């Protein structure tokens, strides 16, 4: 780099997306041979865009334009504190404190390091992690149904953060008033007496969560948002109604506060903000489980001190025991002081465009790291391991791309090897982030869109939803390239409903039930039309993909909530407030309880092996459960949701009784009846996709299964009884997920995992190696060896992609060994350039050696000439 060129561009519009600005920046940069930094101006905002360039690998005289990095929407007045800090850090004076700047090359490197999103993410995670471990010592959540106080407070605090971070993103979009997070303005809203009290959390946050975001706006439903009525004659007319405001005495002017600060916030739905305090009836006796503690009773034990949110003073605390350090000082400050120091973006960064701001993907990382502070598999705390196992973005992107290519290539027509290779190249171009047009003909486009609509993906250990989000965003991008105006995608959704109507006419004999159901389906066509007409193209793509294609299981209910959070944010990003319209033109969030379930995915409840006996019962159940789930997904009215929940519970009870009559094991039938998918606190002790989703199999299973050593598996005896062919008493937990994936897949379905690589060579991996060699078609095996994918972990890893299909005798698969010293930014290029092939039949059961034929021949010669260690005395 010998020089820089700066350009300023004044745009006419008021609002530009990151992608729009990135595309403009790329087009302008194409015209110049030297780096160009562009300053966009529009509507009193400024965006700075820098395009990363690298030398073309084939033509060294040309550059390839890669990622566009932006400091976006800098206000020219009342500039965000985080933007001021970023711009100050880019000054020559500030750069010179850390770097020697004596050329454009060194200046470029210093700027790149300063704008590195990874460094920003690390800084934020460090601050939030410190805050979390400071707060955990100060909060008290009600006992609920969790006896362990440490676990209860950990989960309660993570749940609080989940809700609050979503609210913060809403604030960034202008949907919630800044005043509710401003310590100075809050003194005029609520009564603060002592920073150790919980006035802020109770009066502002709980009323915001449960009585505002979970309640329709007053202008749409009169008197919906109000304080609960006074208790008279020991009668509480609004007892246990958690959608009404509480803590009236904490406000200076309660008669005004709703209209001034809460009335114009849109209703969200979606379950994220439902109060978890519940009433249960057992033997005609009512009792109450308090989890959120949304109550102004004097005996409410809930405590979340105000200083955790509002303190602006940095203080030193001792976290050495938690982090496994010695004599180190850690700094903490109030949560809002931390959040105000960073800029947030609701759009997830991609490999080709990123904003210097915190995006939802980072939040997945943060929450998954915090979840690691309590391990439900081992029932032990492992706080110093926090941050070990979150799958890096580049690994997620790679696994997502390869899974989609493996799925879609089998959907496209081809008759020769050359045609298949040609289709694969076209698919890679389709998935690659580029402004080049795709190369598929109209017939192939229709096939691809139909295949995407039929796609079923599950992550059986979804954690914070990294893979599900990665798949969602990549499929949205594919649909954008194949069908830029959503014409075909819209028609696909309407065709789906028309098929259901046709099936309903044939299968339902009761005329009234039939016509009622058909009318509901016709209404849903109108809803589809409205969605596509009124909302952003990407919103319509995401909504129907989430409904039809995306499924997740995790043993931690709070992990399911975090996955929901990320999916919800992805829908929020494509919506904008419209004054005067119902709910400000914001479409309420869907209900995801029927797509994301808390369960032990490794413990099956088998129906399939008795299908000949129960076939009719099961088919009838699947038909009804799918209809319930379709209706529930988009239901917004609380009364309607309660009605659907009750009807589904009745269906499961009837299904359970039918199974019992047919000699199905009584305890398993009871498990089906007792399972409640709508309770965000419960964990199903079993997993069965038919019962939970109305599905028998999936096209893609993708996961980063939990890393739990065999001696710490709490339910090893259940695994032994669950019929796993690969069971070994010394196997680590992740190995069972391989066989689980195989069972969940349809024929030719794809499994893509990243796990420890011990199974490739260890004795406990023998059965797994044999199982995969005999029953699957390996496609890709990547051995990372000493290369640390998980930066704060010492686990050596591998990625494997296989098809559920018997391998032909000459079947070849791709493999690569990653050197330990490879730089992370060079990983994707290394994978592309260094893949080799190996015959699957040459893999030996006692150890898988990933090497080309020359190495394998040498290994064979050595083994023939030598004497195995086990044969020595």
Q: What positions do the PLM features span?
A:
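Short Lys/Arg-enriched alpha/beta "domain-start" segment
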Residues: 1-28
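Class I S-adenosyl-L-methionine-dependent methyltransferase module
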Residues: 100-103, 172-178, 452-454, 458, ...
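Catalytic micro-motifs at enzyme active sites that drive phosphoryl/nucleotidyl and oxygen chemistry
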Residues: 23-28, 445-447, 537-540, 582-585, ...
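Class I S-adenosyl-L-methionine
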Residues: 99-173, 177-178, 320-541, 545, ...
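Signature of N6-adenine DNA methyltransferases within the class I
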Residues: 33-37, 43-95, 99, 109-140, ...
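Short, compositionally biased low-complexity segments
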Residues: 1-2, 87-108, 175-183, 278-314, ...
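Long recognition/docking surfaces used for binding and targeting
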Residues: 235-376
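Generic amphipathic alpha-helical segments used as scaffolds and interaction surfaces in large
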Residues: 111-123, 144-152, 156, 192-196, ...
């Amino acid at each position: 780099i010998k020089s820089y060129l700066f350009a300023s561009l004044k745009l006419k519009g008021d609002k530009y997306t990151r992608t729009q600005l990135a595309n403009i920046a790329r087009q302008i940069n194409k015209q110049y041979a030297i780096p160009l930094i562009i300053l966009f101006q529009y509507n009193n905002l400024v965006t700075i865009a820098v395009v990363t360039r690298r030398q073309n690998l084939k033509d060294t005289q040309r550059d390839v334009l890669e990622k566009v990095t932006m400091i976006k929407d800098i206000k020219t007045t009342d500039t965000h504190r985080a933007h001021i800090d970023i711009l100050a850090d880019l000054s020559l004076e500030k750069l010179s404190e850390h770097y020697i700047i004596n050329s454009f090359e060194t200046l470029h490197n210093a700027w790149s390091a300063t704008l590195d999103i990874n460094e920003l993410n690390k800084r934020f995670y460090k601050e939030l992690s410190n805050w979390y471990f400071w707060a955990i010592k100060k909060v008290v959540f009600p006992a609920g149904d969790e006896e362990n106080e440490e676990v209860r407070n950990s989960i309660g605090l993570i749940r609080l953060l989940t809700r609050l971070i979503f609210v913060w993103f809403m604030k960034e979009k202008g949907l919630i008033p800044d005043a509710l997070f401003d310590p100075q303005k809050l003194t005029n809203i609520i009564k603060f007496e002592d920073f150790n009290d919980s006035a802020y959390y109770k009066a502002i946050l709980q009323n915001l969560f449960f009585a505002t975001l979970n309640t329709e706006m007053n202008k749409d439903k009169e008197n919906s948002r109000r304080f609960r009525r006074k208790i008279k004659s020991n009668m509480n007319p609004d007892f246990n109604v958690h959608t009404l405001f509480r803590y009236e005495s904490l406000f200076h002017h309660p008669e005004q506060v709703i209209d001034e600060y809460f009335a114009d916030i849109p209703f969200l739905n979606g379950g994220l903000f439902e109060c978890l305090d519940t009433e249960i009836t057992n033997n005609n006796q009512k009792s109450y489980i308090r989890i959120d503690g949304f109550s102004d009773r004097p005996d409410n034990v809930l405590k979340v001190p105000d200083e955790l949110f509002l303190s602006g003073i940095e203080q030193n605390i001792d976290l050495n025991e938690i982090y496994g350090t010695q004599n180190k000082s850690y700094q903490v400050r109030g949560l809002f002081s931390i959040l105000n120091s960073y800029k947030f973006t609701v759009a997830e960064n991609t490999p080709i465009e990123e904003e210097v701001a915190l995006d939802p993907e980072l939040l997945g990382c943060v929450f998954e790291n915090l979840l690691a502070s309590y391990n439900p598999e081992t029932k032990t705390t492992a706080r110093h391991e926090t941050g070990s196992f979150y799958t890096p973005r580049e690994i997620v992107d790679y696994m997502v791309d390869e899974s989609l290519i493996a799925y879609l290539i089998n959907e496209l027509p081809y008759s020769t090897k050359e045609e298949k290779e040609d289709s694969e190249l076209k698919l890679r171009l389709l998935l690659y982030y580029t402004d080049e047009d795709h190369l598929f003909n109209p017939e192939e486009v229709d096939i691809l869109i139909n295949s995407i609509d039929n796609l079923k993906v599950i992550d059986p250990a979804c954690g914070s939803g990294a893979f599900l989000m990665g798949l969602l965003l990549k499929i949205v991008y594919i649909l954008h390239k194949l069908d830029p105006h959503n014409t075909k995608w819209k028609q696909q959704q309407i065709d789906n409903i028309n098929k259901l109507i046709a099936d309903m006419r044939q299968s339902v004999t009761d005329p009234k039930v039939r016509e009622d159901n058909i009318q509901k389906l016709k209404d849903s066509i109108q809803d589809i039309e409205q969605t596509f007409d009124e909302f952003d193209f990407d919103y319509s793509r995401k909504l129907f993909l989430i409904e039809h294609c995306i499924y997740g299981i995790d043993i931690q209910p709070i992990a399911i909530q975090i996955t929901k959070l990320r999916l919800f944010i992805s829908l929020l990003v494509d919506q904008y407030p419209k004054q005067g319209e119902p709910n400000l033109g914001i479409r309420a969030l869907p209900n995801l309880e029927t797509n994301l379930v808390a369960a032990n995915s490794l413990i099956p409840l088998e129906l399939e092996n008795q299908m000949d006996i129960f076939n009719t019962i099961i088919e009838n159940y699947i038909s009804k459960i799918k209809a319930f789930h379709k209706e529930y997904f988009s239901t917004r009215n609380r009364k309607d949701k309660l009605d659907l929940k009750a009807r589904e519970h009745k269906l499961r009870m009837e299904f359970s009784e039918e199974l019992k009559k047919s000699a199905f094991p009584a305890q398993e039938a009871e498990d089906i009846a007792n399972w409640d998918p709508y309770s965000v606190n419960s964990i199903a002790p079993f997993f069965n996709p038919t019962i939970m989703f109305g599905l028998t199999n999936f096209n893609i299973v993708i996961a980063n299964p939990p890393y739990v050593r065999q001696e710490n598996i709490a339910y090893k005896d259940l695994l032994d009884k669950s019929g796993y062919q690969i069971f070994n008493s010394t196997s680590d937990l992740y190995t069972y997920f391989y066989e689980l994936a195989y069972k969940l897949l349809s024929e030719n379905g794809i499994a893509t995992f990243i796990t420890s690589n011990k199974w490739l060579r260890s004795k406990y991996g023998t059965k797994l190696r044999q199982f995969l060699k005999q029953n699957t078609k390996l496609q890709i095996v990547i051995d990372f060896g000493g290369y640390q994918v998980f930066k704060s972990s010492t686990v050596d890893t591998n990625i494997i992609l296989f098809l559920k299909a018997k391998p032909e005798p000459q079947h070849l698969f791709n493999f690569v060994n990653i050197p330990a010293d490879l730089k992370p930014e060079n990983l994707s290029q290394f994978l592309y350039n260094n893949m080799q092939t190996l015959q699957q039949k040459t893999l030996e059961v006692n150890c898988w050696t990933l090497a080309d034929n020359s190495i394998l021949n040498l290994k064979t010669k050595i083994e023939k000439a030598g004497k195995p260690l086990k044969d020595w005395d």
